[in-house]
């Protein structure tokens, strides 16, 4: 294989070289173009690991609009719910760029859990992280004010980074989808934050100048 997916995904980081080699033997590598849907309600259950490129995972609202759940990069994975026989009624994973992905079938993965039980614990940890992120997103969307959604999002990035300068991990259009608004509204809000001397922005890098006043701006 050109890529060792076990070397980049946190799910397998605690395994020894022999165990990783055994897993690599079960994976199938694919080169896929931008805009390829890799997981949908109609696809067979499999674990999908990103070896190169970026993916987006989203669900469709009743009006057909995408609600972005997360952007996946190298080392991230999707599809674990289907491996545990949990139905997928409305979740899609699609490539944002040309990408290299590795897949493991549900049958092979279930056998893997029996042979390498420590993966189960790591799977629980990683899934808890994903659930926490979804709960945080629900908190953003639960507020009617885009000021609150965007400022709290930026302040949460600051907390996670442990510093005032943060990098938004997705395109601004994707962030708008993630926060349930439009790119124009995000742009206007960022401009207001800059005019109020609360942030400085260069591309996707944002420096938070006054976190306390940003909290006040949110309200």
Curated annotation (Swiss-Prot):
The keyword Transcription regulation applies. Keywords: DNA-binding, Transcription, Transcription regulation. SMART domains: cNMP (SM00100), HTH_CRP (SM00419). Residues 144-212 form the HTH crp-type domain. GO terms for molecular function: DNA binding; DNA-binding transcription factor activity. GO terms for cellular component: cytosol. Pfam families: cNMP_binding, HTH_Crp_2. Residues 191-210 bind DNA. It comes from the Bacteria. Gene3D superfamilies: Jelly Rolls (2.60.120.10), Winged helix-like DNA-binding domain superfamily/Winged helix DNA-binding domain (1.10.10.10). The keyword Translocase does not apply. PROSITE patterns: CNMP_BINDING_3, HTH_CRP_1, HTH_CRP_2. This is Probable transcriptional regulator flp.
């Amino acid at each position: 294989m050109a890529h060792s997916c076990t070397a980049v995904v946190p799910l397998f980081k605690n395994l020894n070289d022999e165990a990783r080699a055994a897993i690599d033997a079960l994976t199938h590598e694919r080169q896929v173009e931008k805009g390829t849907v890799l997981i949908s309600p109609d696809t067979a259950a499999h674990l999908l690991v990103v070896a190169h490129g970026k993916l987006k995972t989203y669900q469709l609202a009743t009006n057909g609009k995408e609600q972005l759940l997360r952007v996946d990069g190298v080392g991230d994975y999707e599809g674990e719910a289907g491996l545990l026989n949990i139905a997928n009624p409305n979740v899609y994973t699609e490539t944002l760029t040309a990408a290299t992905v590795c897949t493991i079938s549900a049958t092979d993965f279930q056998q893997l859990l029996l042979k390498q039980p420590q993966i189960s614990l790591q799977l629980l940890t990683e899934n808890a992280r994903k659930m926490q992120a979804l709960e945080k997103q629900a908190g953003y969307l639960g507020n009617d004010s885009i000021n609150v959604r965007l400022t709290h999002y930026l302040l949460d990035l600051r907390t996670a980074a442990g510093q005032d300068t943060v990098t938004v991990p997705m395109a601004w259009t994707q962030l708008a989808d993630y926060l349930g608004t439009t790119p124009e509204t995000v742009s206007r809000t960022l401009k207001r934050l800059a005019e109020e001397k609360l942030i400085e922005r260069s591309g996707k890098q944002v420096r938070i100048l006054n976190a306390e006043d940003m909290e006040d701006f949110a309200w």
